[in-house]
Amino acid sequence: MSRIGKMPIALAKEAKLEISEGNLRVSGPKGVLEQALVEEVKVLQEEGLVKVERINDSKRSRAMHGLYRMLLSNMIEGVTKGFTRKLEIAGVGFRAEMKGDLLALTLGFSHMIYFKAPEGVKLETPDPVTVLVSGIDKALIGQVAAKIRSFRKPEPYRGKGIKYEGEVIRRKEGKAAGK
């Protein structure tokens, strides 16, 4: 049995789970999330706990078991607490600022890069070298953070670029001068 899939999920008091035909809907103080449900797994709700069980032991059922347990857990956490991803900008003259609902990035190119967050994602710049991506959908937060990081990935020689908080950039040594 899946180590992740067999663990029950604690349903927070402020979160509400609705299971309909092939669809999951989780609502809470921060918003509402929906997820289509495959027929290989079923979701059972008991008092304060939610369990995900698989129908049979096929390879696909085993794969979906752990996946849907984590998706449901992330949905419950998202509508109650929310998710935040922090990006750090390193480099001389590199900075970020909010211009209305657009994120304006100066990353050493001849032009500024403007990025509009999709619906359900909030962007903040507490200081010029930090970008906070927050919202209730963990997958969407990660996708938006990866998109912003892709504008100028950290390079290994000087470490300039946009990186996740806590990400370690393996540094390389430059070419050694010959005699």
Curated annotation (Swiss-Prot):
Cysteine pairs bridged by disulfides in the record: none
Gene Ontology cellular component list: cytosolic large ribosomal subunit
Alphabetized InterPro entries for the sequence: Ribosomal_uL6-like, Ribosomal_uL6-like_a/b-dom_sf, Ribosomal_uL6_a/b-dom, Ribosomal_uL6_bac-type
GO molecular-function terms, A-Z: rRNA binding; structural constituent of ribosome
Pfam assignment, any one: Ribosomal_L6
Keywords (A to Z) from UniProt: Ribonucleoprotein, Ribosomal protein, RNA-binding, rRNA-binding
GO biological process: cytoplasmic translation
Superkingdom of origin: Bacteria
Family: Belongs to the universal ribosomal protein uL6 family.
Function field: This protein binds to the 23S rRNA, and is important in its secondary structure. It is located near the subunit interface in the base of the L7/L12 stalk, and near the tRNA binding site of the peptidyltransferase center.
Quaternary structure, from the entry: Part of the 50S ribosomal subunit.
Family matches, as NCBIfam families: L6_bact
The name this protein goes by in its record: Large ribosomal subunit protein uL6
Organism lineage string: Bacteria, Pseudomonadati, Chlorobiota, Chlorobiia, Chlorobiales
